[in-house]
Amino acid sequence: MTSPQTSSLDDIFGSSPPHEDEKFSQRPSIQAPEPSDLPSLRRQHVTAGYRDGVSAAKGEHVQHGFDAGFPIGAQLGMRAGTVIGIIEGLLRGFENRTASRAVKKPLQWKEEGQGTEADEAEAARQAKREQLLRLYQKAVKELEVRSVFAGSEEGSTRDNEGQEKPEVVLRRKGDAVISQWEEQVRVAQWEENMAALEPKEDEQRASTSTEQI
């Protein structure tokens, strides 16, 4: 007969045979087989959830980008259009003046020394027109939307490390480009002149309508 002391030591050092309950607990658990269609259903649900999440997030961010970016683009576009419109108006003015002079001048025989001043004035006018044409072509190229915002995304990532909002970077980039052209074309002076001419045009329309009545 084994003494209680020996039995307790056997339990500590593992020399005693395992108990029945220990044998039962060490048996590997047998999992129930998973239905064959369950993995396929799981993949379908994961895919559907992923697509819904992408659609919801994309729609939200697209709308936010539109709300934040559209006013900036519209404002800068109006400023760029003003610059191009002023140059184009000047260019058309030179073209119309040259065409009217060509129609009004009859073909005449010129004596030696005559017409020198007129020829010089016409040459200066043509040179001015060519200068305006080059300026117009340059403005159209540099104020194109891709040129205005070129490098704004790279600059935001490199310099600000994403701390500034994209629309803020776009506004600053576009303003820097367009402001240079506004100073070169003197847009502020043109707007003042146009504002001064508007009341006169309104008075002329009012007087014309009164005379017709």
UniProtKB/Swiss-Prot annotation:
Q: Give positions of region: deca-GX3 motif.
A: 49-89
Write the record's keywords in alphabetical order, separated by commas. Cytoplasm, Nucleus
Q: Which domain of life is it from?
A: Eukaryota
Q: Where is this region: Disordered?
A: 1-42, 194-213
What processes in GO biological process is this protein linked to?
Answer: protein maturation
Write down any Gene Ontology CC term: cytoplasm
Q: What is its main location?
A: cytoplasm
- Pfam families documented for this protein: Yae1_N
Cellular location(s): Cytoplasm; Nucleus
Q: What does this protein do?
A: The complex LTO1:YAE1 may function as a target specific adapter that probably recruits apo-RPLI1 to the cytosolic iron-sulfur protein assembly (CIA) complex machinery. May be required for biogenesis of the large ribosomal subunit and initiation of translation.
> Assembly and interactions?
May form a complex with LTO1.
Question: What family is reported?
Answer: Belongs to the YAE1 family.
Name this polypeptide is given: Protein yae1
Q: Which organism is it from?
A: Neosartorya fischeri (strain ATCC 1020 / DSM 3700 / CBS 544.65 / FGSC A1164 / JCM 1740 / NRRL 181 / WB 181)
